């Protein structure tokens, strides 16, 4: 039985265009004639079982998480130029030597916590260090430590040169999490991300509902 992911105010731009007219409440278009929909329902072949990023490695969970969270590096499936991996929350990076990588971060990113808490190098260090204590440790093979250089720059040390390390940073379970949310004792802090949608409700075995982030830092999505 297929499980449902419900995205209020739509979900992904491509999917929204492809399934326009399917499901949800009607709303009049700007010209007052043709209604459009505010809800997109997506079926998945497997049940969602865990939304704690670093304690799961399930593709069904990642369908949700890649809408609510974002990674340092963006995996390009070929639709956005020739580069296989491009900037995500990191604008650029370079190997200083075989074992040290400097990453510069976007300065306009906020967590979807309702407080517009900025995403900084402290959050990146926190996320990567935490990963080494969880089941996704293998996804960060070779990681030694991170050093915050300034608010929006971080240095990552790896054990030996590995040209695939940057690729590992595009893994959904390594999406950047809010250090402040954990420090403040927020309930289920792993649900707070930087993506265009935020967690609303999950009924296990039935559906998971996300809502659009009204003050999303990136390009406005449908």
Briefly describe each language-model feature range:
Residues 36-46, 100-104, 124-127, 154-156, ...:
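Short, well-ordered beta-strand elements
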Residues 35-36, 48-55, 80-83, 112, ...:
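Short, solvent-exposed loop/turn elements at domain surfaces
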Residues 76-80, 169-222:
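Gly/Pro-rich hinge or "lid" segments in bacterial periplasmic/extracellular proteins
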Residues 94, 102, 136-180, 198-203:
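Surface-exposed binding/hinge segments that line
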Residues 91-135, 155:
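Aromatic- and charge-enriched surface segment that lines or borders ligand/interaction sites
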């Amino acid at each position: 039985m297929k499980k449902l992911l419900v995205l209020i105010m739509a979900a992904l731009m491509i999917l929204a265009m492809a399934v326009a007219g399917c499901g949800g409440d009607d709303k009049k278009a700007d010209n007052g004639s043709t209604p459009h929909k505010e809800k997109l329902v997506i079926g998945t072949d497997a049940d969602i079982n865990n939304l704690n990023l670093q304690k799961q490695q399930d593709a069904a969970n990642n369908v949700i998480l890649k809408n609510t969270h974002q990674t340092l590096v963006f995996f390009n499936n070929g639709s956005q130029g020739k580069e296989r991996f491009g900037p995500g929350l990191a604008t650029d990076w370079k190997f200083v030597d075989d074992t040290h990588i400097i990453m510069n971060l976007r300065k306009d990113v906020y967590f979807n916590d309702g407080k517009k808490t900025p995403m900084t190098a402290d959050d990146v260090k926190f996320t990567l260090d935490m990963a080494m204590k969880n089941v996704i440790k293998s996804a960060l093979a070779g990681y030694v430590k991170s050093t915050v250089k300034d608010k929006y720059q971080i240095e990552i040390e790896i054990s030996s040169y590995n040209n695939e390390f940057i690729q590992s940073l595009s893994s959904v379970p390594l999406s950047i999490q809010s250090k402040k949310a954990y420090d403040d004792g927020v309930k289920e802090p792993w649900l707070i991300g930087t993506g265009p949608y935020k967690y609303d409700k999950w009924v296990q075995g039935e559906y998971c509902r996300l809502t659009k982030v009204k003050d999303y830092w990136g390009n406005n999505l449908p």
